Amino acid sequence: MENNNNNFIEEEEELSEPKEKCGVFAIYAPELDVSRIAFFGLVALQHRGQESCGIATYDEFQSVHVETGMGLVNQVFNETNLKPLKGKMAIGHTRYSTAGKSTLVNAQPVIVQTLHGQIGIVQNGNLTTAKSLRKELMQKGVGFFIDSDVEVITQLLSNNPEGCDPHKPNWENRIAHFMSKAEAAYALCLMTPNGIYGVRDSLGMRPLCLGSLEVPCKDDPTKTITRYVLTSESCAIGTIGAKFIRDVRPGEIVHINENGITSFIGRSPSDNPALCVFEYVYFSRPDSSMEGQLIHIVRQRMGETLARESPPPQTCSNNDTIVIGVPDSSLPAAIGYAKQSGIPFTEGLTKNRYIHRTFIQPSDHLRQQGIKLKFNPLTENIQGKKVILVDDSIVRANTIKALIKLIRGAGATEIHVRISSPPVLHPCHMGIDMATYDQLIGHNRTVEEIREYIGAESLQYLTLEGLMKSVNIGIKPQAETNSTPCFSTSSPTTTKIKINENNQKHCVACFTGDYPCSLDF
């Protein structure tokens, strides 16, 4: 049942923090309870979307079973509604709306009936050409029932590409045809009668990775068979007891079914790949790996680089100063800053991780508490100390301003803010809710004006050069991170992604305004 109550704490958070659109998960394993595995996979991806979620399964009789709902994964699903989700494969989704309203009708998976059976789809990202593609389809007489990009994708996949036999599914050709029309930004999983396809756009803008698990054979439990999973982040692979294989490559189509796994190039990968750098800064869980490196380690390097670029003021010493981070995503950067600067790291804030999605409306008194319901200072650690407060980003500055007031109220004598990313100057149009130009404080004010607004003694950001150095230094080519042949060719194929001249292979448009593809908004 959809709950339309507004949440004041969630609204407060949305005013201050960028939001990832979605998390996707898929598994093919007829021997297992795939809906239950998908459930735990989605729990691991909960941080990527908290508005709605859903699971769909395909059974041996070619029937699709689906359950969606508004709220967190463990609020929507239980033993009763998981039990009917029988099947040999499953796809799942956690959603935060950046294209389409936050309503149950826009929850995923989306199921569509085609001439070749039902298909289900889950997607992360925004189509940068959604407007023109929607218009093109409507001119052909196609109607739309929801305002999410995923319906555009399903309609394109339902249409038979020119030159293909309309009596055959040709899913690989259909997907490649869709990819030819949509450069970015998407990572999606498509469930068909013939298995699951994982698809990543040619820029690699949204993450998608591949894992495997060994399961007992149905006919002979003493033997095992390898099955496969696809997911937005590797943390979900570990959660279900699977083994990480590799990232899905830009432009790649990965097909998992009864016969195992095959791989195709759906669209030639770009010479300038553009994985969203905010995956490293904020979105991904610290225990996930991308491009062969652990997110936690990258964030710690960001903190170390930040300390070299913007060291503590000379008035601060390791006797009277502490480094604290804003829980949770900023803690690795704070640890790195402390390590490099020699100023001790201390826990200064605790976070209530369970209140931001409550639908219980607060009294006027509690509403006035604002940020205090989400964060609480450790007064004994802070009182009488100079504080270096490390956060991962400033978007609108509402949260950081409130936290500074909270920390000062706990007895801090000085507060120096250090941000482990550059100023956010431009909105994102590729799957992240990052406000508009009018709402971005970095676009409208100087660093000094922001410092004055938030009430800090000093404010300094990590440079773009420092950010990219922290990210790029640990990237491992696919050939180093995995030697498993997953391509349809007879020998293993590796694709070394080209790095352009300034060694920048990530989307940094929110910092520079240089978008990696054309937009038709």
Swiss-Prot record:
Catalytic residues in the record? 22
Q: Which GO terms describe its cellular component?
A: cytoplasm
- Kindly indicate whether the keyword Phosphoprotein belongs to this entry: no
Necessary cofactors? Mg(2+); [4Fe-4S] cluster
A GO BP term here is: purine nucleotide biosynthetic process
State which Enzyme Commission number(s) the record gives.
2.4.2.14
| Family statement | In the C-terminal section; belongs to the purine/pyrimidine phosphoribosyltransferase family.
| Protein name, per record | Amidophosphoribosyltransferase
Protein encoded by which gene: purF
